[in-house]
Amino acid sequence: MDRLDSLVTRRAAVGAIGTVLASSGVVYGASRLDTESDESTGLPFHGSSESTGFGIDLDGHPIMGAPDAALDMYYWGDYQCPFCRRFEQNTLPEIIEKHVRTGTVRIVFIEYPYLSDASMTAAVMDRCVWRQVRDERPSRYWPWHSAVFDAQGEKNSGWASRPNLLEITRGVQDVDATAVDACMRKRGYGIEQEIGTDVEQASSFGIRGSPGFVLYDPTTQEAGKLVGAQPHDRFDAAISKLRNE
């Protein structure tokens, strides 16, 4: 997959979607200020109804890390994407240890289902799981997210069917598969429209596949983009560059 390290100003990047954001509009406080850490990982998750200075609407997206982290990392992924699974297994743990736990980076998880209808099914379920846990047990999103990637099979082989994903969900503690199923039935179409908007916005940033990443510094209003299952040292370099280290 293509790799891009270009460093661009926030205004130039957001201008690509025809939007000019005043610097005073940069918002990083979570609307739900209480963060919860998973007992096994110690990773804080939170939600927000705000938009960032880069133009990302945080509503509906799980956020891992401190609300006041120095940098945002927007991560577009597809549960069927083998490169995303490689990133999750080989690179993400290093990013979490070196940059999330230390308060430097917070990660915003954004769905980019592009491989098939099954990818959209998984993306909608992701939104429904987050909707269920975000207010009282936001950290429970992480075991579900990890379980789905652990169960990944060949793309479009049927492993990401709704019944199979619900079976995976039943195996995750404190995630109610019945409520998730009801959410998909009641809200599925609307959620698909929201995800479609996210995909269009990602495309305007030059994201054409998954995984795709934008690192954004709200202080300098600069951003760096990475595409593909890059090794952790590529992220280390991008983070250092944005922080002028």
Predicted regions and their residues:
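Short clusters of hydrophobic/aromatic residues that line enzyme substrate/ligand-binding pockets
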Residues: 62-64, 154, 226
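C-terminal cap of thioredoxin/glutaredoxin-like
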Residues: 2-18, 28-30, 171-245
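Alpha-helix initiation and N-capping motif
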Residues: 23-26, 141, 162, 177, ...
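Structural alpha/beta surface segment adjacent to cysteine/selenocysteine redox centers
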Residues: 79, 85-170, 208
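Extracytoplasmic thiol/disulfide redox context detector
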Residues: 2-116, 193-194, 238-245
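Active-site-proximal beta-strand/loop segments in catalytic clefts of secreted hydrolases
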Residues: 76-78, 110-113, 146-149, 185, ...
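Intrinsically disordered, low-complexity coil segments
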Residues: 42, 131-138, 187-193, 219
